UniProtKB/Swiss-Prot annotation:
Species this chain originates from: Ruminiclostridium cellulolyticum (strain ATCC 35319 / DSM 5812 / JCM 6584 / H10)
Entry keywords, A to Z: Cell membrane, Ion channel, Ion transport, Membrane, Metal-binding, Sodium, Transmembrane, Transmembrane helix, Transport
Topology of the protein relative to the lipid bilayer: Multi-pass membrane protein
Transmembrane segments: 4-24, 35-55, 68-88, 99-119
One matching Pfam family: CRCB
UniProt-annotated binding residues for Na(+): 78, 81
Protein name: Fluoride-specific ion channel FluC
Activity regulation statement: Na(+) is not transported, but it plays an essential structural role and its presence is essential for fluoride channel function.
Source domain of life: Bacteria
Length: 130
């Protein structure tokens, strides 16, 4: 029964995260005419920041709440961020003759997503120490 509750927590969070990703992607893609996959980049940077922030806060404030951790990180942020879409869009850029965009997407994604995690963890440590 305990595992089923964990599965429900992850599944519910996954729904929230995936629906949020869809909403943001749709909104950003209506505004983006460049051909660069900015929506996925924004989502992955935001998700990276939030996973750094939330994991650090959860570790500091409620380390024993596994269900909340599963719901927020594995569920919501797992459903929100998307490495597979990043990969597909990058391959499509290369195959579509936009190699420069492909390289830029790789560099920006890695640099900003890692930076997002670090900044999120730093902010969480500051919040937790207040």
């Amino acid at each position: 029964m305990k595992e089923m509750i964990n599965v429900v927590a992850v599944g519910t969070g996954g729904f929230v995260g995936a629906a949020s990703r869809y909403f943001i992607s749709t909104l950003v893609n209506k505004l983006n005419t460049s051909g660069f996959p900015i929506a996925t980049l924004i989502i992955n940077i935001l998700g990276s920041f939030l996973i750094g922030l939330l994991t650090q806060l959860l570790m500091s404030l409620c380390p024993d709440n596994k269900k909340l951790n599963l719901f927020l990180t594995t569920g919501i942020l797992g459903g929100f961020t998307t490495f597979s879409t990043f990969s597909l869009e990058t391959v499509n850029l290369f195959q579509g003759g936009k190699a420069v965009f492909g390289v830029v997407n790789i560099v920006l994604s890695i640099a900003f997503c890692l930076t997002g995690v670090v900044l999120g963890k730093m902010l969480a440590k500051t919040i937790a120490s207040m």
